[in-house]
């Protein structure tokens, strides 16, 4: 059993009041020998390799992981950024994005809230990611409000739609953008 409190204060990520430098990886459920089926033993070896490599964070790319993976992350102390299975970047970020039409709102909200309900009791989950590269529309605004109404204990994340979440990211930064963010350090 574990407990955690996650706060972002003055751009510092705090877990249980302690600053944490997140050192993470993206993880897809796949294995070179078994394909998209990963055995419990293979999952455990993955998590143990992460610990040996001083990795403390996993982003579930681009869908929630097998339930056993969360058990292992709870057991070994790996932080998880849980990501909803919403990826529609074939429509990318324009007005064609499925994140805009109101008729797609129930699908967005349902997928995100299903992830939250399924994994809300895992202390390893330190952040809810609304999805991946699926546009900046109103459907994500609605879903983020639903997440916060259900769980205020974790920050929310989404790629590029940074104005609606607690922690945004730019997964394809230009060299100039990266330099400007680094402040020539």
Q: What are the residue ranges of the model-derived segments?
A:
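Substrate-binding/catalytic cleft of secreted carbohydrate-active enzymes
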Residues: 47-53, 57-185
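N-terminal carbohydrate-binding accessory modules
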Residues: 1-50
